Design a protein with these regions (language model features):
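Terminal amphipathic alpha-helical/low-complexity segments used for targeting or macromolecular assembly
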Residues: 1-41, 48, 203-206, 212-276
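Structural signal for interior beta-strand "rungs" in well-ordered beta-sheet cores
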Residues: 29-216
């Protein structure tokens, strides 16, 4: 029913899918001083994937599936259950804890736990992302980190339709829409939602809800450069990954912009009042 349900069920789905596909073994390049911890029957490395020296792959708690063209750089550690998509790169020293799914052509560094990254998402640098859902072409600046557990260990609430919704879960991170970008050092609260094409810069304790297409700079919401500039940026980013911007995508984005205009204006209005 809710996006956080995807995070809850993803580890068990990963295990079921591995059994269903029935693939195991190493077809790609596996360096002689990389290591497998646990049952090697729970590891599948597709042809064209490359595992560098000092990588540790741990299947103790679930299977690991590394797809064609993926590259795992030195000293990275990967825990199952985990899926790593085609041409995705896991950066040196990354700590990929259990329960993660990464789509195609992602760049993943730092620490990640029980999260879903859609294709072309970029988390190149250090920082923690846990129990989160990250959309396509999201770019997380260096040291961007989210909280996924409250200090009092109570259930995390998430804002939906302007009201807090009890998730029923102790661990809930962030839900970040396609093409949203964060600055270096951005710190997300537990249960944060950021919509489409947001531009978020670090500064103090951040809100738990970011309307789509809003900019958040110097601790306040603002309109930013407007939709046309956002679309041009998206086209540039997609072109760098050899993805074409489709007319259908632009239509959907423009419709979403109109649908979220009122909540965006309201957030900007409240920011102006509190900054006076």
């Amino acid at each position: 029913r809710y996006p956080w349900d995807l995070i809850v069920y993803n580890p068990s789905v990963l295990k079921d899918d591995f059994i269903r596909y029935g693939r195991k073994g190493i077809k790609g390049e596996f360096h002689s001083i990389a290591a497998i911890v646990g049952d090697s029957e729970k590891l599948y490395i597709e042809e064209g994937a490359k595992i560098h020296p000092f990588v540790v792959i741990d299947t103790t708690h679930g299977p690991v599936y590394i797809d064609r063209g993926a590259e795992i750089f030195p000293s990275a550690r990967i825990e199952g259950p985990c899926y790593i998509g085609k041409d995705t790169q896991i950066m040196p020293g990354a700590n990929i804890r259990e329960g993660n799914s990464f789509g195609d052509v992602c760049r993943i560094g730092g620490e990640v736990e029980e999260s879903i990254f859609y294709s072309y998402a970029n988390k190149y640098h250090d920082g923690f992302i846990g129990h989160s859902y990250i959309g396509e072409f999201v770019n997380l600046g260096a040291l961007t980190t989210n909280s996924d557990l409250k200090n009092d260990y109570s259930n995390v609430s998430v804002y939906l339709n302007g009201k807090p919704q009890d998730t029923g879960s102790l661990k809930v991170g962030s839900f970040i829409g396609d093409h949203t970008k964060t600055s270096i050092g951005t710190l997300f609260n537990t249960g944060t939602i950021a919509g489409l094409m947001c531009n978020i810069t670090a500064g103090g304790i951040l809100p738990k809800y970011f309307p789509s297409f809003a900019w958040y700079v110097n601790n306040k919401f603002m309109k930013g450069y407007g939709l046309d500039m956002m679309i041009n940026t998206a086209k540039t980013v997609m072109g760098r990954r050899k993805r074409q911007w489709l007319d259908e995508e632009e239509y959907a984005i423009r419709v979403a912009y109109e649908m979220t205009e009122e909540e965006r204006k309201e957030a900007i209005k409240k920011s102006r009042k509190t900054s006076k």
